[in-house]
Amino acid sequence: MKIATLSIGDELLRGEVVDTNAARIAARLADAGLAVGRHLTVGDDEGEIEAALGMLAPAHDAVIVTGGLGPTDDDVTARAAARATGRRLVLNEAALDRLRDFFSRRGRELYPANERQCLLPAKAGLIPNALGTACGFHLLHGECFLVFLPGVPAEMARMLEESVVPLVLDRRSGPEVTRTAVLTLFGLSEAEIGGRLSGLERSRGGLGIAYCVDFPVVQVKLRATARSEEEAAEIIAGGLPLVRERLGDVIVAEGDNTIDTAVARLFREKGLTLALAESCTGGLIAKRITDVAGSSAYFFMGLVTYANEAKERLLGVPTALLAEKGAVSADVARAMARGARHVAGSDLALAVTGIAGPDGGSDDKPVGTVYLALADRAGCSVKSYRFAGERDAIRTVTAVTALDWLRRRLLTA
């Protein structure tokens, strides 16, 4: 099935808004075993939209359009759709009834501008929008199934999931079904991962492997398309053990899980507790720990000791040590971790100190220098790193590196 997506909006072309809708549509369709083969972006220009539809429709089985369905003068998608398909623009009574009910239930007045949102191409099928005023709709133009959705991401996502994916799947020819499996990796580059999995697709009939970088992790997506659910599941089940064997312990999570949820699960399973002392990450590790519901069962506390005085007063880092070694050093990281464990009384304590930039680096300790320390009842270990990138990238990769160290430590507990 050949599918295209079309995003509409001047704000997209100007770079004022990132087009997350196109990515979400492509990813969701891929999960359903469908591939988007082409994507276009045009501005809020009726002629440009009509031309784009005229180009895409004859070459595709389905085109999914987002944007331009609002109540303002620059929302011209419905008019362009009517022109492109040779239909009249008519007041859709079902859409108007829905809109009246939408406003009535909220105690709001229905404005004429909102009523214009119900002017749709003749014989358009409605796509329910529970979250907003824009009327989604679909048309059959020749052999092409045209779908029109609002550009508001939350509205689009719900309509995509509840209505559009089932509609598109119903139009797919053949009984093929798709199963997928997702592995999240940390510690290897995309090229290194590809090298380890080289040849696996050729040796496993029907198995497809794709790679997606979501810095600083990489996702490996296994996909099997077959004539039955059982056959597709069998292909995935046969490929997963081989992938796990080749990738080993760089796999940090599977399915919808993340490294954050993997660490949370291990803390609960092992019955251990954690304290954090952060400097250059500014609480980012603690945020990721507490983003997982139920983390209070194992996370005692997190201290952001950014200034040297805070390291001294709250963690007991000796003033002389800071003066001699500097705040960014293995010795200070070790003292921070030991101090955090002492203050919290936790089983484990992790500390981080480093230079995230853009200033503060030197020849001996350039920007990107980071020290992590992990203390437990047996002692304290320190690791040093030289990360590259801008400030946010250095802080992010530091936080994930810390979580991965916790994950590996818990696996051996």
From Swiss-Prot:
Xref: InterPro entries: CinA, CinA-like_C, CinA_C, CinA_KH, Competence-induced_CinA, MoaB/Mog-like_dom_sf, MoaB/Mog_dom
Cysteine-cysteine disulfides: none
Q: Which SMART domains match?
A: MoCF_biosynth
Cite a single Pfam family from the UniProt record: CinA
Q: Where is the secretion signal located?
A: none
Q: Which family does it belong to?
A: Belongs to the CinA family.
PANTHER family named among the record's database cross-references = NICOTINAMIDE-NUCLEOTIDE AMIDOHYDROLASE PNCC, NMN AMIDOHYDROLASE-LIKE PROTEIN YFAY
Please state what the protein is called.
CinA-like protein
